[in-house]
Amino acid sequence: MNSNYPLFWIKEILTNGFVENILYIFIIMAFLTGIYSIIANLIKFVINYINIKITKIITLIENWLKKSDSSFVYFILLLYLLLNIHISLNFVLYFRIVILGFISIKNMEISTLISFIDYISEIIANIIDRNTLKMGGTDSDSNPLSHVYEFASKSSKPKEVEKAIPNLPENVPKYPGKIVKPVPNNLLEKRGLSSMSVEMPSNTTNPSDIERLNNLLEDIKKSLELYDNQSLKFRKHISEVNNNDPNCVYDPRSKELFKDYIKLVDLLKDQQKDMGNKIINELKNIDPNIKHKYFK
């Protein structure tokens, strides 16, 4: 075979197991890239056209390659491996990534080479996925909502509607150190929607000390009223038990429990009265003219 023929260089490299001249590698890369691009596209077109599963073709090629031993087979094997990479990653992966595996191709089984290619393909696919998620920064600064926006922006809608609707801002909250850009009201108006508004209470000022203390005092009075009502109910139940009232639904032994409840309520009332008297003292310190009666 003529030594100037590229297939001769391929066979020499694969047979000797080492590269004597790096120039051969670049020549082979350029040659195979062009040939591969044509063959790969033709094979993909045929596969898609006849709708045959790619695994069946791969199995046939593997069985054929195992039985053959010629320089042409080595050449086809290289193209076949490149085709596997192209199918899995959807772009051409050049020899410089898997050249070590190709150099020792004669001494390696096809299953080993396929496993090697799959391993490299998985690594590169993961890198591609990570880069797809990046928005011009690091992984920590990625914006997962960008895919949602991109999908929504490509959704089908009439052209006249698309021209009338302005572009929505792509900015989404990113914390910390990011600013959220609100959507202007004119975007809502052009869609026939009412403007966004927030209803605020008419009185948003902080209450004065006197108002705050008076509110606390009113709460204490309501609590004392509730405690008084509860104490009356407990005393009524005790009276029903003592008088053997037929309408009484409680066991006679519950009388002692109700007495404990009354003691607890009286203790809570005393605490509330003590708090109320302290509040009255504070009010009188602020304004001596305040006329609040102390709790007894």
From Swiss-Prot:
Main localization, broad class: mitochondrion
Cellular location(s): Mitochondrion
Protein keywords: Mitochondrion
Domain of life: Eukaryota
GO cellular component: mitochondrion
Protein name: Uncharacterized 34.3 kDa protein in ATP6 5'region
Lineage of producing organism: Eukaryota, Fungi, Dikarya, Ascomycota, Pezizomycotina
